[in-house]
């Protein structure tokens, strides 16, 4: 129900882990098969990532942490290393990248949801089933860097309607049972959109 309210209509979701059901043993969702797996388009994954960042911004703090030591100073001390190689200190570091999630399954291949902020503008990229991942473990990050570079080189966020603007086809609206039968309509806030650099 939640993803449908976000406009995601054709995804197949069988669990919250993202793993194939075969890893979950007896803990699979009733009515799903033991080998079922979540299926989503790149667009759907980007929508989920956008909502994660908007609704739970604190998740970004975890996503951008390169390494974390648990149970420090004890005999159970464990260092966990982030699988996102685009973070500072890693092989595929790219300035501005601060998340978000890697994933690999037999069906989906090597995947990565990358997020980056540059000049105050954040983008979300999604790479699914990166080619040659078995030969080059950096493949998903190389393709992500290409997407990020292309986006910032060819697109920009631009204010298309300032606050107070009136829409040509909607300068007034009817007011039921009001003292006045119509009232003027204008935008409370400015409207900005991503537009191609070559568009006027």
Predicted regions and their residues:
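Short, charged, amphipathic alpha-helices and their helix-cap/turn boundaries
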Residues: 1-18
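Short linear capping/connector segments at secondary-structure termini
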Residues: 15-21, 65-66
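Domain-terminus/edge residues, biased toward the C-terminal soluble/receptor-binding domains
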Residues: 25-200
